[in-house]
Amino acid sequence: MSLNMFWFLPTHGDGHYLGTEEGSRPVDHGYLQQIAQAADRLGYTGVLIPTGRSCEDAWLVEASMIPVTQRLKFLVALRPSVTSPTVAARQAATLDRLSNGRALFNLVTGSDPQELAGDGVFLDHSERYEASAEFTQVWRRLLLGETVDFNGKHIHVRGAKLLFPPIQQPYPPLYFGGSSDVAQELAAEQVDLYLTWGEPPELVKEKIEQVRAKAAAHGRKIRFGIRLHVIVRETNDEAWQAAERLISHLDDETIAKAQAAFARTDSVGQQRMAALHNGKRDNLEISPNLWAGVGLVRGGAGTALVGDGPTVAARINEYAALGIDSFVLSGYPHLEEAYRVGELLFPHLDVAIPEIPQPQPLNPQGEAVANDFIPRNVAQS
């Protein structure tokens, strides 16, 4: 099975070390462009663009990267709690059309009550997933070309429609990650690819089996992906030394503050990440070559595969054997590590190299009539 390898655009900051200004660098458009173009040339399938108040806006970043790349796909967040599904569907179709079919979408429900409150969202965990399920139903139906009437608990639309369809059919793929039962049910019923953070293989296997069974109950099959950091070097010793350097500037106070911030979230996935290290520096290798040091101060994905190219490739293939076909990777700093992964790791894997998409012809059309419909040739109607 050929593997889809993704990289990451660090719109929330980048550098050589975690938890310090030492070794940090400006993350401007030029730097992000360098990373995107490196990923484009090295054969990555796409890049994940993060979301949240600590990040630049993912959709605007994607739009600015489309003209400077050729084959790279962009995985950006859909935020059900803060965006109308009809507006999001129009935006998604536009990005897909402007990128010639290179748009991918990642459903993000949110997990930090403080950040959500700042965005005007005061729904609890179960309510957010109710709203996300309704949002996704409307979003998908619009992209499928339906005129939608929907009267849900959280979302109400009447006569919603999309005049300009996406390039990808039936619609751009929808990704999603969540570890709670309600999250897995949403994935099983509505998404195309289920993402998990980098837990040990036995825990990932358990999650995949749960989601696969839930999807089968809905008569569906979905794909699986995993989100990991990577520290790959020419030798295993060099890789482990690089891992230690990454957290060499962390002090106990910074770790404690970060863990306190993570503890206030209601994300089951974040709780599972924290349980891998319990905020302690010792015993960070939680599974062969799987290191939890990143999660001491970084929310979300908090584990890294560490080793030389053949060793890391062997661990990736262990996950692939569980049914995972997509790997969303990152490393610090992201420009240099994009090259290291491409040069030291890719030769040991069966990497799916994306082709440059051919321009898709769009049907000619006149201006929309009354902002409501596309005119047809009356003589042919």
Curated annotation (Swiss-Prot):
Keywords: Flavoprotein, FMN, Monooxygenase, Oxidoreductase. Its EC number is 1.14.14.5. The keyword tRNA processing does not apply. Pfam families: Bac_luciferase. Coiled coil: none annotated. GO terms for biological process: alkanesulfonate catabolic process. It catalyses: an alkanesulfonate + FMNH2 + O2 = an aldehyde + FMN + sulfite + H2O + 2 H(+). One of its GO terms (molecular function) is alkanesulfonate monooxygenase activity. Belongs to the SsuD family. FMNH(2) which is absolutely required for this enzymatic reaction, is provided by SsuE. PANTHER family: ALKANESULFONATE MONOOXYGENASE (PTHR42847), ALKANESULFONATE MONOOXYGENASE-RELATED (PTHR42847:SF4). Catalyzes the desulfonation of aliphatic sulfonates. Homotetramer. This is Alkanesulfonate monooxygenase. It comes from Escherichia coli O7:K1 (strain IAI39 / ExPEC).
